[in-house]
Amino acid sequence: MAGAHSTPLWSRHLLKAVLMVLVALFLVHSASAQSHREFASPGQQKKETSADILTQIGRSLKEMLDTWLGPETMHVISETLLQVMWAISSAISVACFALSGIAAQLLSALGLDGEQLTQGLKLSPSQVQTLLLWGAAALVIYWLLSLLLGLVLALLGRILGGLKLVLFVAGFVALVRSVPDPSTRALMLLALLTLFALLSRLTGSRSSGSHLEAKVRGLERQIEELRGRQRRAAKMPRSMEEE
């Protein structure tokens, strides 16, 4: 049963990871292209367009999505996303300009150069769009790195657990064979068992803590469901009496 439940779980995690990789590549490519258009000089744009690896990855990803979904579907999706992103960026840009104007007036009233100090808040819609794309790409990449590190740590935990067991068995056999005195052998075996128990406790505390958290959350959900059922059951007799 555990294997049957764990296989779909791993497949779902793998599917999420693949989708997030595609989304991250798309966002990084879009943000890179937008930042080149917005912040780079024309000569630098020509040089970086041909040599940028993100541009090549973005083109390959676009060709792959065109093959999967079709060029017309991809065109509609990209146009819709661009319009939504531009509307959000324009609204944020207007808010930034309004905030910079208010801050400039307040700073000027204090005798400071408000226009110069608030120049960084005056962001155009294209600059806001670039920042949003890079921020979304950073969040997706952070999620991917967290997932990858969790998988690596889980694998290392399994490897260290097996290595710990092998070392314990080897130490146990060596003690039984090499120590002739029963009292000394018992003390050394007790020390070995204590060390093994401490290592098991230290290495298993994090995983057991996560399992306990999951169990507590499951119990909390069950309690909330029971409370909801009790409330609905208590309301039903009242409604019947009123009728």
UniProtKB/Swiss-Prot annotation:
It is a multi-pass membrane protein. Pfam families: BRI3BP. One of its GO terms (biological process) is cellular response to gamma radiation. Residues 34-83, 157-185 are lumenal. Keywords: Endoplasmic reticulum, Ion channel, Ion transport, Membrane, Nucleus, Sarcoplasmic reticulum, Signal, Transmembrane, Transmembrane helix, Transport, Voltage-gated channel. Residues 1-33 form the signal peptide. It catalyses: K(+)(in) = K(+)(out); Ca(2+)(in) = Ca(2+)(out). Disruption phenotype: Viable and normal in appearance. The chain crosses the membrane at residues 84-104, 136-156, 186-205. Residues 105-135, 206-243 are cytoplasmic. InterPro entries: TMEM109. It is found in: Nucleus outer membrane; Endoplasmic reticulum membrane; Sarcoplasmic reticulum membrane. Coiled coil: none annotated. GO terms for cellular component: endoplasmic reticulum; monoatomic ion channel complex; nuclear membrane; nuclear outer membrane; sarcoplasmic reticulum membrane. GO terms for molecular function: voltage-gated monoatomic cation channel activity. Functions as a voltage-gated monoatomic cation channel permeable to both potassium and calcium. Plays a role in the cellular response to DNA damage. Homooligomer. Interacts with CRYAB; in the cellular response to DNA damage. This is Voltage-gated monoatomic cation channel TMEM109. It comes from Mus musculus (Mouse).
